Design a protein with these regions (language model features):
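Elongated, mostly alpha-helical coiled-coil "stalk/stator" tethers of large membrane protein machines
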Residues: 1-161
């Protein structure tokens, strides 16, 4: 159910962003909201608490976000409250972020190696990935796992290269 909710609302937000030529604006705004929600656990708990009435939650959204983010984003947050899905807000915004990255052909790659890679090795990995995929850039995440005997494991979405 959570995936369905995040997909429905995330797709609607993405379509609106594309239609209005505001993909970058919406992306920045949703990233900001994600930061606010992650830094303020009490806000998330309050917004999901069943004893706080919807009107109070709506007023809270207005007070916090109105004038700081677009009316479309405020409307989305209010709709999530209205439909009792505010607890899925992070999922919706992460889904939207992933859709934007795919739209802009920005891949996310997790590289795990047996030892720390040099700057040159990291550049070589990224260059090879750019040559062999349809992406124009990557968000690269590197991690060392001493349990690996040698080499590296590259994860990109649901693909794994060993």
């Amino acid at each position: 159910m959570a995936k369905l909710v995040s997909k429905i609302y995330g797709d609607a937000l993405f379509e609106t962003a594309v239609e209005e030529h505001r993909v970058d604006d919406f992306f920045e705004e949703t990233e900001g909201i994600l930061r606010v929600l992650e830094e303020n656990e009490e806000l998330s708990r309050l917004m999901s608490h069943p004893q706080v009435v919807k009107e109070e939650k709506m007023q809270l959204i207005e007070n916090i976000f109105k004038g700081k983010v677009s009316d479309e984003i405020v409307g989305l947050l209010e709709l999530l409250v209205e439909k009792d899905h505010f607890g899925k807000t992070k999922d919706v915004l992460v889904y939207f972020r992933d859709e934007v990255k795919e739209y802009k052909k920005i891949g996310t790659v997790h590289v795990t190696s047996a030892m720390e890679l040099s700057k040159e090795q990291k550049e070589q990995v990224e260059k090879k990935l750019l040559e062999t995929t349809n992406y124009v850039s990557f968000e690269m995440h590197y991690e060392v796992d001493t349990a690996l005997i040698g080499g590296m494991v590259i994860r990109m979405g649901d693909r794994v290269v060993d």
